[in-house]
Amino acid sequence: MPRSQKNDNFIDKTFTVVADILLKVLPTTRNEKEAFVYYRDGMSAQAEGEYAEALQNYAQAMRLEVDPYDRSFIFYNIGLIHTSNGEHTKALEYYYQALDRNPSLPQALNNIAVIYHYRGEQALAAGNIPDSETLFEKAAEYWKEAIRLAPLNYSEAQNWLQTTGR
């Protein structure tokens, strides 16, 4: 039974019902519909912390999805899973792939900045000031772009940029 048919969460159920209706009425191919089902099931598994299952669903969605914009969200969600698992290098790879397909994805830019900021903090704690400054500058660069795309979001990043003079 697909995960989307097992949801106990009201919001997930509502989303599933609305998505199923849209899939029936919108002119989409069979592969597009199937890709969306895998993507939706991946999001559901990811929300429940079932990362291995989510990655399997995203892999299937990726196999079927051809639209670069839609693929960007699959890459982004895979990046989120790797971030949650502390696999920052892998996460960055997926965030960059998401941005290659959708340069206007501020949440990917934000997450890249968060990883660089974290690495900058680690370098600073280790006494490596030159590396920390380089990493903080990279974080600032990505946060500025995320804020440019979504000026009402990322208030903590805006505060950090302001207080550090970046």
From Swiss-Prot:
Its main location: plastid. The keyword NADP does not apply. TPR repeats lie at residues 35-68, 72-105, 120-153. It comes from the Eukaryota. It is found in: Plastid, Chloroplast thylakoid membrane. One of its GO terms (cellular component) is chloroplast thylakoid membrane. PROSITE patterns: TPR, TPR_REGION. InterPro entries: PSI_Ycf3_assembly, TPR-like_helical_dom_sf, TPR_rpt. One of its GO terms (biological process) is photosynthesis. It holds the Pfam family TPR_1. It is a peripheral membrane protein. Keywords: Chloroplast, Membrane, Photosynthesis, Plastid, Repeat, Thylakoid, TPR repeat. The keyword Transcription does not apply. Belongs to the Ycf3 family. Essential for the assembly of the photosystem I (PSI) complex. May act as a chaperone-like factor to guide the assembly of the PSI subunits. This is Photosystem I assembly protein Ycf3. The gene is ycf3.
